[in-house]
């Protein structure tokens, strides 16, 4: 039986290959080009021995009649500890010029999600050291978190800070999948990890903006497969994806190239299924856990767009970054009224944490309602209680800002890691009026409440 086929049509990244009728490849089989490093992945069987494939690499120089060999297996990538500290592409090949990976085991990138009876739920909290996140939308170990934000509000910087904090404090293994992001960010990220001495605990998989859609669509699965392998060894792994929107976008490009009819806003008709297939694999089993943090670009700041809206349903916590808060110079620009977490429940985090978080939100919500009155009539028209509310809300707003370790180069102020206990103590004090006499500038860009008191002395 012949496993050789020949190219009959090339349209951009979509290549049609003809095989003898008894040797037709299965969907998702990997095909390799003779005398070239290019791999094709079968997407459809068109009939008469012809299969439609997506090129995982540049299709420049391909022409009809070229020979292709069916490997009779899916794309497999290296897994295990040899991948740590290395940068790989969608096929698991090294792109850091540091020689072969040398992995002993390989796994196919398409796998089924763990069965229902293998799953395990966890309510253990993962402390991030970022005040606003730990207070308002705490993360669960083995949970899924989305960082939602438009262009330029700080998704990648937040993600890098989370990786740095968790990698240093949590000291487990991490896998980072760069899906359709800027190559410069990938480079910065690599050096940031190197400087923080956590590179030997991170496996990096990149399919950046300049890559063909096939690479960007599959690179998330490559990273996920590596994370699953660590989980199946009984470890607790962190899996970072930047950016899940580009995964959807690559799916849209591939879908259009394959000739499928687009659905709402031009997205692929299989959007929910593609997203579900990826997200359902990111889960914790009885052997180990995957805690996933995903950056989600929000097109035109519209959270109802089909791509972010589909992602919402899969997450345990959502961190929403707001342009309005960023414009006030408050970073991280997390919107405390829009961000949510399933863990913010008195049975999970305790009464003290829950009540403090809710009171912070109520104070900020009251300030939001009063802002129109203040804009029209000024502060003098408010009742004494409302004036106090506004003053505390402005302090809370500023206290939610924090200097980041990864942003030291830009800000010049050293990063701060604030423990959850310290965070709750600080916000509780503001709400109870313990710091009513301290000017609001003292609360801006500091770590714990002790620093506020120190800073306030310099204003006197």
From Swiss-Prot:
Subcellular compartments: Cell inner membrane
UniProtKB keywords: ATP synthesis, ATP-binding, Cell inner membrane, Cell membrane, CF(1), Hydrogen ion transport, Ion transport, Membrane, Nucleotide-binding, Translocase, Transport
PROSITE patterns per record: ATPASE_ALPHA_BETA
Major localization listed first in the record, in broad terms: membrane
One Gene Ontology MF term: proton-transporting ATP synthase activity, rotational mechanism
Domain of life: Bacteria
Gene3D superfamilies on file: 2.40.10.170, Bovine Mitochondrial F1-atpase, Atp Synthase Beta Chain, Chain D, domain 3 (1.10.1140.10), P-loop containing nucleotide triphosphate hydrolases (3.40.50.300)
EC identifiers of the protein: 7.1.2.2
Pfam family, one: ATP-synt_ab
Binding site for ATP: 149-156
Cellular component GO terms held in the UniProt record: plasma membrane; proton-transporting ATP synthase complex
InterPro entries (alphabetical): AAA+_ATPase, ATP-synt_VA_C, ATP_synth_F1_bsu, ATPase_a/bsu_AS, ATPase_alpha/beta_chains, ATPase_F1/V1/A1_a/bsu_N, ATPase_F1/V1/A1_a/bsu_N_sf, ATPase_F1/V1/A1_a/bsu_nucl-bd
Family designation: Belongs to the ATPase alpha/beta chains family.
Role of this protein: Produces ATP from ADP in the presence of a proton gradient across the membrane. The catalytic sites are hosted primarily by the beta subunits.
NCBIfam families per record: atpD
Record's protein name: ATP synthase subunit beta 1
Source organism of this protein record: Nitrosomonas eutropha (strain DSM 101675 / C91 / Nm57)
């Amino acid at each position: 039986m012949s496993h050789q086929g020949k190219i009959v049509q090339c349209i951009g990244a979509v290549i049609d290959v003809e095989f003898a009728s008894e040797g037709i490849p299965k969907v998702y089989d990997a095909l390799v080009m003779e005398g070239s490093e290019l791999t094709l992945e079968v997407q459809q069987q068109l009939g008469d021995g012809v299969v439609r494939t997506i090129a995982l690499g540049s299709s420049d120089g391909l022409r009809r009649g070229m020979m292709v060999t069916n490997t009779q297996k899916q794309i497999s990538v290296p897994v295990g500890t040899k991948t740590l500290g290395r940068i790989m592409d969608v096929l698991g090949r090294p792109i850091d010029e540091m020689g072969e990976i040398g992995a002993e085991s390989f796994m196919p990138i398409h796998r089924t999600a763990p069965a229902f009876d293998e799953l395990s739920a966890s309510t253990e909290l993962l402390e991030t050291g970022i005040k606003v996140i730990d207070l308002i939308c705490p993360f669960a170990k083995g949970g899924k978190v989305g960082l939602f934000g438009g262009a330029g509000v700080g998704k990648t910087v937040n993600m890098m800070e989370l990786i740095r904090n968790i990698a240093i404090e949590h000291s487990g293994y991490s896998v980072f999948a760069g899906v359709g992001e800027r190559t410069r960010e990938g480079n910065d990220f690599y050096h940031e990890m190197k400087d923080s001495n956590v590179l030997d605990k991170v496996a990096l998989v990149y399919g950046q903006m300049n890559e063909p859609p096939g690479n960007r669509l599959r690179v998330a699965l490559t990273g996920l497969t590596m994370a699953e392998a660590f989980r199946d060894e009984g470890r607790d792994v962190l899996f970072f994806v930047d950016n899940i929107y580009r995964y959807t976008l690559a799916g849209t490009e591939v879908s259009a190239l394959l000739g499928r009819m687009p659905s709402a806003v031009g997205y692929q008709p299989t959007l929910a299924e593609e997203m579900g297939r990826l997200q359902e694999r990111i889960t914790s089993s009885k052997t180990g856990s995957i805690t996933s943090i995903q950056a989600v670009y929000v097109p035109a700041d519209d959270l109802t767009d089909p791509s972010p809206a589909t992602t919402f349903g899969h997450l345990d916590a959502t961190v929403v970054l707001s342009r309005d808060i960023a414009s006030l110079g408050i970073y991280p620009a997390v919107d405390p009224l829009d961000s949510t977490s399933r863990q913010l429940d008195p049975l999970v985090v305790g009464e003290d944490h829950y009540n403090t978080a809710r009171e912070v939100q109520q104070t900020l919500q009251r300030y939001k309602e009063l802002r129109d009155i203040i804009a029209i009539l000024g502060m003098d028209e408010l009742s004494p209680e409302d004036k106090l509310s506004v003053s505390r809300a402005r302090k809370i707003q500023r206290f939610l800002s924090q200097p980041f370790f990864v942003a030291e180069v830009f800000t010049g102020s050293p990063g701060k890691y604030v423990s959850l206990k310290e965070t709750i103590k600080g916000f509780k004090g503001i709400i109870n009026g313990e710091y009513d006499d301290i000017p609001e500038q003292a609360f801006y860009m500091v770590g714990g409440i002790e620093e506020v008191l120190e800073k306030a002395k310099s204003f006197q």
